Amino acid sequence: MPNLRGIRDRIKSVKNTQKITKAMRLVAAARVRRAQEQVLAGRPFADRLVGLLFRLRSRLRFEDVQSPLMERRDVQKVLVLVIAGDRGLCGAYNSNIIRRTVQYLRELQQQGKQFALYLVGNKAISFFRRSNFPIAKTLTNVDPNTPLEGANQLITDDILAPFLSGEYDQVELVYTRFVSLISSRPTVQTLLPLDPDALGQEDETFKLITKGGGFEVLREKQQVRTEPEFAADTIFEQDPTQLLDALLPLYLTSEVLHALQESSASELAARMTAMSAASDNAKKLLSTLTIVYNKARQASITQEILEVVSGANA
């Protein structure tokens, strides 16, 4: 016969765990909304920056512009920037980004290229420190909600210096693209050299909305507004090439920030999903334990009645 006290203790433990998972789910949902607000708040600056760069490129299209950030070289060594999480309890988020990174590194090895890793997040650091892949730099406790003094500027500085010095010929970014609350996509993107033809492409923003008593993600395409080109007789106080060289690092910083925000939203959405599943499992387990407890209690009462009746008959 099951121990009634043991079952009661287990039911109490499951209820406490369920409270924790529900709270973590709500916290993750609130942080996804905050990440959404950060993306929308930074969008006007990014739009104007891209628009200005597009106009400068159009003005300089007939000139031989040699910006060091757009210089394409024979790729011999690649710096791979990997953005993962600092904590667990977020489903397969960290394992997916690590798996995609390892796959990409194997591809570089097959091509005979050298590489080094720039790891962001404790989970990626702990995994790759146990591997044989070379690590150039690590960064933890990243907060993408501080765009001016935050990690995006630090990361940009860390990848710009070795690229401009020729230590690395290319910088690749591996991050998690936020698709929906139940879906994310590990993505590989070239950060450096910058592609001038990609400046006018479409971008997307995400918005967390409530629907049917739950949460849903609405993604919206944002067409970059390309303002009218500079007039042919426009006089610049500085050389347009110098302006381009000054604005390109800002564009790179905004790209890094965007990747941090997408990765952060993906991690939080994965944590929401994981905690929601844990809460549902706890509910099912409570139902099962309650049935077991009631059956055990009923059997115990029946046994006591039988003992009383047997004693009376004796």
Swiss-Prot record:
Which key words are in the record?
A: ATP synthesis, Cell inner membrane, Cell membrane, CF(1), Hydrogen ion transport, Ion transport, Membrane, Transport
According to the lineage, what is the superkingdom? Bacteria
Q: Where in the cell is it found?
A: Cell inner membrane
MF GO annotations: ATP binding; proton-transporting ATP synthase activity, rotational mechanism
What InterPro entries does the record tag this protein with?
ATP_synth_F1_ATPase_gsu (IPR035968), ATP_synth_F1_gsu (IPR000131), ATP_synth_F1_gsu_CS (IPR023632)
How this chain sits in the membrane, per its record, is: Peripheral membrane protein
In this entry, which stretches build a coiled coil?
A: none
Q: Name one GO cellular component term.
A: plasma membrane
* HAMAP family per the UniProt record, alphabetical: ATP_synth_gamma_bact
Query: What's the subunit arrangement here?
Result: F-type ATPases have 2 components, CF(1) - the catalytic core - and CF(0) - the membrane proton channel. CF(1) has five subunits: alpha(3), beta(3), gamma(1), delta(1), epsilon(1). CF(0) has three main subunits: a, b and c.
Q: Tell me its family.
A: Belongs to the ATPase gamma chain family.
User: What NCBIfam families does the entry give?
Assistant: ATPsyn_F1gamma, PRK05621.1-2
> Which PANTHER family does the entry mention?
ATP SYNTHASE GAMMA CHAIN (PTHR11693), ATP SYNTHASE GAMMA CHAIN, CHLOROPLASTIC (PTHR11693:SF41)
What is the name of the protein in this document?
Answer: ATP synthase gamma chain
Q: Which organism is it from?
A: Gloeobacter violaceus (strain ATCC 29082 / PCC 7421)
